[in-house]
Amino acid sequence: MAPKKDKVPPPSSKPAKSGGGKQKKKKWSKGKQKEKVNNMVLFDQATYDKLLSEAPKFKLITPSILSDRLRINGSLARRAIRELMAKGTIRMVSAHSSQQIYTRATHG
C-alpha cells in the first residue's frame, strides 16, 4: 500500500473565531468643558478708545464680534453698537430678533 497523504482541509472563507466571550465595556468620556471667558462689564478708557477707532473699520460688526475682539460682554457690545449708530460711524445691514448685523458707514 502506498503511504497515505495527510489531507489538509480546504481553507474556509470565514475568518476563524477569535475567542468571543465578554467584550470590554465602553468607558464614558469626560465631557469637554468650555473655558470661561472673563470679559469686561464696564469700559475702561483704553478699550473705549479702541472701540471708537477700530470698530468702524470692521467689515462686519455684530455684538458677538465686538465681544470677542474687545473682550467685553454681550450687553456692553450692544450698547457700544447703539452708540456707534448714533454717531453715524456704522450702519445697519440686517436686524433679526436674535442677531443684528452692521457694517462700516460708507460716505457717499
Swiss-Prot record:
Cite the Pfam families for this sequence. Answer: Ribosomal_S25
Q: Which domain of life is it from?
A: Eukaryota
Report the GO terms under cellular component.
cytosolic small ribosomal subunit; plasma membrane
Extent of Basic residues compositional bias: 22-31
Question: Keywords on this record?
Answer: Ribonucleoprotein, Ribosomal protein
Q: State the InterPro entries in the record.
A: Ribosomal_eS25
Q: In this entry, which stretches build a coiled coil?
A: none
Indicate yes or no for the key word Ribosomal protein. yes
Q: Determine if Calcium is one of this entry's keywords.
A: no
Q: Which stretches of sequence are listed as region Disordered?
A: 1-36
Listed GO MF terms = structural constituent of ribosome
Stretches that traverse the bilayer: none
**Family as reported in the entry's similarity comment:** Belongs to the eukaryotic ribosomal protein eS25 family.
Name assigned to this protein: Small ribosomal subunit protein eS25x
Species of origin: Arabidopsis thaliana (Mouse-ear cress)
Q: Which gene encodes it?
A: RPS25D
